[in-house]
Swiss-Prot record:
Substrate binds at residues 28-31, 83-86, 96-99, 123. This is Ribose-5-phosphate isomerase A. One of its GO terms (molecular function) is ribose-5-phosphate isomerase activity. InterPro entries: NagB/RpiA_transferase-like, Ribose-5P_isomerase, Ribose5P_isomerase_typA_subgr, Ribose5P_isomerase_type_A. The active site is at 105 (proton acceptor). Keywords: Isomerase.
Length: 236
Protein backbone atom coordinates (compact mmCIF):
# COMPACT_ATOMS: atom_id res chain seq x y z
CA UNK A 1 0.00 0.00 0.00
CA UNK A 2 1.44 3.35 -1.08
CA UNK A 3 1.94 6.47 1.03
CA UNK A 4 -0.81 8.33 -0.88
CA UNK A 5 -3.21 5.46 -0.09
CA UNK A 6 -2.42 5.76 3.63
CA UNK A 7 -2.88 9.52 3.57
CA UNK A 8 -6.24 9.09 1.91
CA UNK A 9 -7.23 6.47 4.51
CA UNK A 10 -6.43 8.88 7.35
CA UNK A 11 -8.33 11.66 5.58
CA UNK A 12 -11.35 9.39 5.06
CA UNK A 13 -11.50 8.74 8.81
CA UNK A 14 -11.52 12.49 9.47
CA UNK A 15 -14.32 13.35 7.04
CA UNK A 16 -17.18 12.17 9.35
CA UNK A 17 -15.94 14.67 11.97
CA UNK A 18 -17.01 17.51 9.69
CA UNK A 19 -20.62 18.45 10.40
CA UNK A 20 -23.03 20.62 8.48
CA UNK A 21 -22.55 24.32 9.23
CA UNK A 22 -19.04 23.96 10.64
CA UNK A 23 -16.36 26.62 10.49
CA UNK A 24 -13.38 24.55 9.47
CA UNK A 25 -9.64 25.21 9.52
CA UNK A 26 -8.03 23.44 6.58
CA UNK A 27 -4.37 22.49 6.73
CA UNK A 28 -1.50 22.43 4.28
CA UNK A 29 0.52 19.54 2.86
CA UNK A 30 0.02 16.27 1.04
CA UNK A 31 -2.26 14.65 3.64
CA UNK A 32 -4.34 17.81 3.93
CA UNK A 33 -4.58 17.78 0.13
CA UNK A 34 -6.17 14.32 0.29
CA UNK A 35 -8.64 15.64 2.87
CA UNK A 36 -9.49 18.63 0.66
CA UNK A 37 -10.40 16.36 -2.25
CA UNK A 38 -12.72 14.29 -0.05
CA UNK A 39 -14.23 17.40 1.52
CA UNK A 40 -14.90 18.78 -1.94
CA UNK A 41 -16.89 15.65 -2.78
CA UNK A 42 -18.99 16.13 0.35
CA UNK A 43 -19.57 19.82 -0.41
CA UNK A 44 -20.72 19.00 -3.93
CA UNK A 45 -23.09 16.46 -2.38
CA UNK A 46 -24.68 19.17 -0.23
CA UNK A 47 -22.53 19.56 2.90
CA UNK A 48 -22.44 23.18 4.05
CA UNK A 49 -19.16 24.29 5.61
CA UNK A 50 -16.96 27.36 5.53
CA UNK A 51 -13.24 26.76 5.39
CA UNK A 52 -10.33 28.90 6.51
CA UNK A 53 -7.19 27.89 4.57
CA UNK A 54 -3.75 27.88 6.18
CA UNK A 55 -1.81 28.76 3.02
CA UNK A 56 -2.19 30.11 -0.47
CA UNK A 57 -1.70 26.58 -1.82
CA UNK A 58 -4.58 25.35 0.32
CA UNK A 59 -6.75 28.28 -0.74
CA UNK A 60 -6.20 27.42 -4.40
CA UNK A 61 -6.92 23.72 -3.80
CA UNK A 62 -10.13 24.51 -1.90
CA UNK A 63 -11.34 26.90 -4.59
CA UNK A 64 -10.69 24.22 -7.18
CA UNK A 65 -12.90 21.83 -5.18
CA UNK A 66 -15.66 24.41 -4.72
CA UNK A 67 -15.25 24.67 -0.93
CA UNK A 68 -16.58 28.02 0.39
CA UNK A 69 -13.84 30.01 2.12
CA UNK A 70 -13.46 32.83 4.60
CA UNK A 71 -10.65 34.40 6.59
CA UNK A 72 -10.01 34.53 10.33
CA UNK A 73 -11.06 38.16 10.17
CA UNK A 74 -14.48 36.90 9.05
CA UNK A 75 -14.53 33.89 11.41
CA UNK A 76 -12.24 34.49 14.40
CA UNK A 77 -13.40 31.28 16.12
CA UNK A 78 -13.45 27.92 14.33
CA UNK A 79 -15.11 24.64 15.26
CA UNK A 80 -12.45 22.24 14.00
CA UNK A 81 -9.11 22.21 12.20
CA UNK A 82 -7.93 19.21 10.21
CA UNK A 83 -4.24 19.27 9.33
CA UNK A 84 -1.28 16.99 8.75
CA UNK A 85 1.95 16.73 10.74
CA UNK A 86 5.57 15.93 10.03
CA UNK A 87 5.93 14.18 13.41
CA UNK A 88 3.62 13.40 16.31
CA UNK A 89 4.62 11.82 19.62
CA UNK A 90 2.58 9.92 22.18
CA UNK A 91 1.68 13.14 24.00
CA UNK A 92 0.27 14.68 20.80
CA UNK A 93 3.18 17.09 20.53
CA UNK A 94 3.86 17.87 16.89
CA UNK A 95 6.48 19.08 14.47
CA UNK A 96 4.80 20.91 11.62
CA UNK A 97 5.91 23.27 8.89
CA UNK A 98 7.44 21.03 6.25
CA UNK A 99 5.20 22.88 3.82
CA UNK A 100 6.43 26.27 5.12
CA UNK A 101 2.96 27.24 6.38
CA UNK A 102 3.63 26.86 10.12
CA UNK A 103 2.69 30.41 11.13
CA UNK A 104 -0.76 30.36 9.56
CA UNK A 105 -1.24 26.72 10.56
CA UNK A 106 -0.63 27.52 14.22
CA UNK A 107 -2.80 30.64 14.18
CA UNK A 108 -5.69 28.69 12.65
CA UNK A 109 -5.23 25.69 14.97
CA UNK A 110 -5.24 27.85 18.10
CA UNK A 111 -8.35 29.67 16.85
CA UNK A 112 -10.16 26.31 16.68
CA UNK A 113 -12.07 24.56 19.43
CA UNK A 114 -10.45 21.29 18.35
CA UNK A 115 -7.53 20.23 16.16
CA UNK A 116 -7.28 16.77 14.65
CA UNK A 117 -4.11 15.61 12.90
CA UNK A 118 -4.21 13.20 9.97
CA UNK A 119 -1.07 11.32 8.92
CA UNK A 120 0.37 8.00 7.93
CA UNK A 121 1.72 6.03 10.87
CA UNK A 122 5.36 6.68 9.94
CA UNK A 123 4.86 10.17 11.40
CA UNK A 124 4.26 8.69 14.87
CA UNK A 125 7.56 8.87 16.78
CA UNK A 126 8.79 8.22 20.29
CA UNK A 127 10.89 11.39 20.41
CA UNK A 128 10.47 14.47 18.23
CA UNK A 129 13.35 15.77 16.15
CA UNK A 130 14.25 13.35 13.37
CA UNK A 131 12.31 15.63 11.02
CA UNK A 132 13.97 19.06 10.77
CA UNK A 133 12.23 21.61 12.98
CA UNK A 134 11.24 24.70 10.96
CA UNK A 135 11.70 28.12 12.51
CA UNK A 136 10.17 31.08 10.68
CA UNK A 137 12.30 34.20 11.02
CA UNK A 138 12.25 37.82 9.93
CA UNK A 139 14.61 38.66 7.07
CA UNK A 140 15.93 41.69 8.95
CA UNK A 141 19.02 40.66 10.89
CA UNK A 142 18.75 37.03 9.81
CA UNK A 143 22.44 36.37 10.53
CA UNK A 144 22.14 37.61 14.10
CA UNK A 145 18.88 35.73 14.53
CA UNK A 146 20.49 32.51 13.31
CA UNK A 147 23.27 32.83 15.88
CA UNK A 148 20.72 33.49 18.63
CA UNK A 149 18.75 30.42 17.54
CA UNK A 150 21.95 28.36 17.69
CA UNK A 151 22.46 29.50 21.29
CA UNK A 152 18.85 28.70 22.20
CA UNK A 153 19.22 25.22 20.71
CA UNK A 154 22.33 24.56 22.80
CA UNK A 155 20.69 25.81 26.00
CA UNK A 156 17.80 23.39 25.40
CA UNK A 157 20.24 20.46 25.31
CA UNK A 158 20.07 19.91 21.55
CA UNK A 159 22.83 19.59 18.97
CA UNK A 160 22.81 19.69 15.20
CA UNK A 161 22.97 22.10 12.30
CA UNK A 162 20.80 25.00 11.19
CA UNK A 163 20.17 25.42 7.47
CA UNK A 164 18.17 28.10 5.69
CA UNK A 165 15.54 26.48 3.49
CA UNK A 166 15.68 26.99 -0.27
CA UNK A 167 13.30 26.36 -3.14
CA UNK A 168 13.99 23.54 -5.60
CA UNK A 169 15.28 26.25 -7.95
CA UNK A 170 17.98 27.15 -5.42
CA UNK A 171 16.43 30.48 -4.47
CA UNK A 172 15.92 31.16 -0.74
CA UNK A 173 12.40 30.13 0.27
CA UNK A 174 10.01 32.82 1.46
CA UNK A 175 6.80 31.99 3.30
CA UNK A 176 3.39 33.41 2.42
CA UNK A 177 4.15 36.07 5.03
CA UNK A 178 7.47 37.00 3.40
CA UNK A 179 9.70 35.37 6.03
CA UNK A 180 12.60 32.93 5.82
CA UNK A 181 12.66 29.39 7.22
CA UNK A 182 15.55 27.98 9.23
CA UNK A 183 15.48 24.18 9.43
CA UNK A 184 16.92 22.84 12.68
CA UNK A 185 18.39 19.41 11.96
CA UNK A 186 18.69 18.17 15.51
CA UNK A 187 18.04 14.43 15.33
CA UNK A 188 16.15 14.45 18.60
CA UNK A 189 14.55 17.03 20.89
CA UNK A 190 14.68 15.71 24.47
CA UNK A 191 12.68 18.62 25.95
CA UNK A 192 10.35 20.24 23.38
CA UNK A 193 8.93 22.67 25.93
CA UNK A 194 12.39 24.00 26.83
CA UNK A 195 13.32 24.43 23.17
CA UNK A 196 10.02 26.16 22.45
CA UNK A 197 10.59 28.65 25.27
CA UNK A 198 14.15 29.29 24.14
CA UNK A 199 13.14 29.96 20.56
CA UNK A 200 10.38 32.33 21.66
CA UNK A 201 12.99 34.38 23.53
CA UNK A 202 14.79 35.20 20.25
CA UNK A 203 13.44 38.53 18.91
CA UNK A 204 13.78 37.64 15.21
CA UNK A 205 11.79 34.42 15.52
CA UNK A 206 8.28 34.81 14.09
CA UNK A 207 7.10 31.24 14.79
CA UNK A 208 8.42 27.72 15.19
CA UNK A 209 7.07 24.33 14.19
CA UNK A 210 6.62 22.82 17.66
CA UNK A 211 2.88 22.50 18.28
CA UNK A 212 2.60 21.78 22.00
CA UNK A 213 -0.74 21.30 23.74
CA UNK A 214 -2.65 22.17 20.57
CA UNK A 215 -3.70 18.88 18.96
CA UNK A 216 -6.63 16.98 20.50
CA UNK A 217 -6.25 13.78 18.48
CA UNK A 218 -4.25 12.19 15.69
CA UNK A 219 -5.61 9.79 13.08
CA UNK A 220 -2.81 7.50 11.87
CA UNK A 221 -3.02 5.06 8.97
CA UNK A 222 -0.64 2.09 8.74
CA UNK A 223 -0.31 -0.61 6.10
CA UNK A 224 -0.99 -4.24 6.94
CA UNK A 225 -0.50 -6.05 3.68
CA UNK A 226 -2.83 -4.45 1.17
CA UNK A 227 -5.05 -2.98 3.87
CA UNK A 228 -4.89 0.36 5.66
CA UNK A 229 -5.40 0.07 9.41
CA UNK A 230 -6.40 3.33 11.08
CA UNK A 231 -5.69 4.08 14.74
CA UNK A 232 -6.40 7.14 16.87
CA UNK A 233 -4.26 8.92 19.46
CA UNK A 234 -6.29 11.03 21.86
CA UNK A 235 -10.05 11.46 21.58
CA UNK A 236 -11.94 12.37 18.44
Amino acid sequence: MSAPDLKRAAAERAIPLVEDGMRLGIGTGSTAAAFIKLLGERVRAGLKVTGVPTSEATRIACEREGIPLATLEDLPELDLTIDGADEVDGSLRLIKGGGAALLREKIVAVASRRMVVIADASKHVETLGAFPLPVEVNLFGIGATTRAVEAAVARAGCTGEIVRRHEASGAPLLTDGGHAILDLRLGRIPDPEALSAGLWAVPGVVEHGLFLGIADAAILAAAEGDTAVVSVLGRL
